[in-house]
Amino acid sequence: MAVSLPNSFLQISPCVPSLQLRKPVMAAVKGGKQSVRRSSNTVVQITCRKKELHPEFHEDAKVYCNGELVMTTGGTKKEYVVDVWSGNHPFYLGNRSALMVDADQVEKFRKRFAGLSEIMEIPVLKGEIIMPTKKSKGPKGKKK
């Protein structure tokens, strides 16, 4: 399933539009008559990007998750490989998702606490359990 993401920022043309600047109109007075001289329009182009410094931008970059094409977007690489995307992440799926547990974390836990299983066994007691009685405290007051 391929999903195209429209993004107005990514669709901007990389070329900066040219700015047209007009020279001011100059007025000259000849013999009491005012004549106007107009200068020709000049085009000034301003670019802030240095050539061969910025990465090439690909309009149709493909995003793969578990070997399946999940969306098409723009980016500096032709294709991206991701482990989690909004289609399989529990945060976005809500009640439809199963609990996602990373197997590596479970294995780390088992390795770390493998030796504690012998210590952590709870002994089974047989017979009566006798609780010690509490000692009564003396009357409250000042001692002399």
Curated annotation (Swiss-Prot):
Keywords from UniProt, A to Z, are: Chloroplast, Plastid, Ribonucleoprotein, Ribosomal protein, RNA-binding, rRNA-binding, Transit peptide
Identify one Gene Ontology CC term for this UniProt entry.
ribosome
What Gene3D superfamilies does this protein's entry cite? Answer: Ribosomal protein L31 (4.10.830.30)
Q: What range is the organelle transit peptide? A: 1-48
Cellular localisation: Plastid, Chloroplast
Q: Name one GO molecular function term.
A: structural constituent of ribosome
Q: Name one GO biological process term.
A: translation
Please give the InterPro entries that the UniProt record associates with this protein: Ribosomal_bL28/bL31-like_sf, Ribosomal_bL31, Ribosomal_bL31_sf
Family the UniProt entry places it in: Belongs to the bacterial ribosomal protein bL31 family. Type A subfamily.
Subunit record text: Part of the 50S ribosomal subunit.
Q: Which NCBIfam families match?
A: L31
- What's this protein's function? Binds the 23S rRNA.
| Listed name of the protein | Large ribosomal subunit protein bL31c
| Lineage, uppermost ranks | Eukaryota, Viridiplantae, Streptophyta, Embryophyta, Tracheophyta
